[in-house]
Regions:
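Low-complexity, glycine/serine/proline-rich disordered segments
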Residues: 1-91, 99-105, 111-113, 196-202
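Domain-level detector of nuclease and nuclease-like folds
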Residues: 69-202
Length: 202
């Protein structure tokens, strides 16, 4: 901490060290701060300091896996994502879903985790919405989910955007235990302020 007790402007690594030394937070709350690469915002809750997830420029570790407990932005329009303690994508959201203007689909990374026979590379933010073709936006989806249930919702979004309407999206991705194959997608979205929700089993 600074001499006056302030934490303003500290790097993630400095704050992580300070928090551990001061013993004002539990170890698991510090998670991967040394590698986050961002200046942190910190606060207090019930007299105990808390560490918020922060946006990191590079969500991947040296092995090419997503880092745990981070927020990041990716894709053509920098949509928002979060990972859980196991480095699995747990949420993606945007207040302004957009359609890409480029022609043709991007080649995507097919080495996604948790896939079983027949699974597809499920883009959380679809290619037509400028979604990333990398593992920071791809999870294992059943053929039915990818080509039918999820796609039907995406078609609604695309139609609304093409009509000049505003679309927001928030999707929580659920897993079974420590597995990397999603078991459910809890989809919430608005079209010009009208709210819709749907749960899709995978």
């Amino acid at each position: 901490f600074l001499e006056n007790g302030s934490r303003e402007g500290l790097t993630s690594a400095e704050l992580a060290d300070a928090l551990l030394v001061s013993q004002k937070v539990e170890y698991e709350d510090v998670w991967d701060l040394r590698n986050a690469g961002d200046v942190l915002e910190s606060g207090s809750k019930g007299g105990t300091s808390t560490v918020q997830k922060v946006f990191t420029d590079n969500p991947f570790d040296e092995a090419g896996n997503l880092k745990p407990n981070i927020k990041y932005q990716t894709g053509e329009f920098k949509y928002n994502y979060e990972t859980d303690a196991n480095g699995r994508i747990s949420n993606w959201n945007t207040d302004n879903l957009q359609l890409t203007e480029r022609d043709g689909r991007l080649n995507y990374n097919s080495d996604f985790l948790g896939k079983i026979e027949g699974d597809h590379a499920g883009h959380l933010a679809g290619d037509r919405f400028g979604g990333s073709p990398e593992l920071d936006n791809i999870v294992s989806q059943s053929q039915n989910v990818n080509l039918s249930q999820y796609k039907k919702i995406e078609n609604q979004w695309a139609k609304a955007i093409s009509e000049g309407k505003e679309v927001t999206v928030n999707i929580d991705i659920k897993y079974d235990g420590d597995g990397f194959r999603p078991i459910e997608f809890n989809v919430e979205y608005t079209i010009d302020g009208d709210f819709f929700s749907q749960s899709i089993l995978n």
